[in-house]
Amino acid sequence: MEFQSIAPDVKLGENVTIHKFVNLYGCEIGDHTKIGVFVEVQKNAKIGKNCKISSHSFICEGVTIEDNVFIGHSVVFINDTYPRATNGQGRLQTEEDWKVEPVLVKRGSSIGSNCTILGHVTIGENAIVGAGSVVTRDVPPNAIVAGNPARLIRTIDFPTHPEDKEARYVLYEFLRNQRS
């Protein structure tokens, strides 16, 4: 029984790990990248080297993810600013009826679980996007953003270790205060 759908035009780097129930169409995935279960990566999407794409994430056409990026569980990228079912003539839209709004995630960034990243956004190098955030505009390099819409919490001097307790504490405190 087949548990993956990998189109013949997919370009896979060396030592790529692809878990079950994954759909890959016309995309590029760099060396040593891990793709979790129930992930879909559409055509013309690019994922760099040493990335981790966690389960249930959706990476649509026009998304570029550079090297060393972490994508949490259930992250959704959106490439259409004004999605509609039908075109101006009242017919079901086709690929010719819409324009892809690109998304760029720069190297070393981390996007927390359950985030939504809207089209025409750049997430800067080493940025951290807090879990559950909705990113509607560009995120500066070395920034921590969180919320709906995501807003700047603070910047961090990089390089930092992925287990930087100060960065995690700042993000935790922000999210905790949002609930109260």
Predicted regions and their residues:
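Acidic/histidine-enriched, glycine/proline-rich intrinsically disordered or flexible terminal extensions
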Residues: 163-180
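A generic membrane alpha-helix/interface feature
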Residues: 56, 86, 91-92, 138, ...
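Conserved beta-strand-loop-alpha-helix hinge in the C-terminal portion
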Residues: 141-166
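Flexible, glycine/small-residue-enriched loop-and-beta-strand segment within the central core
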Residues: 1-8, 18-121, 149, 156-157
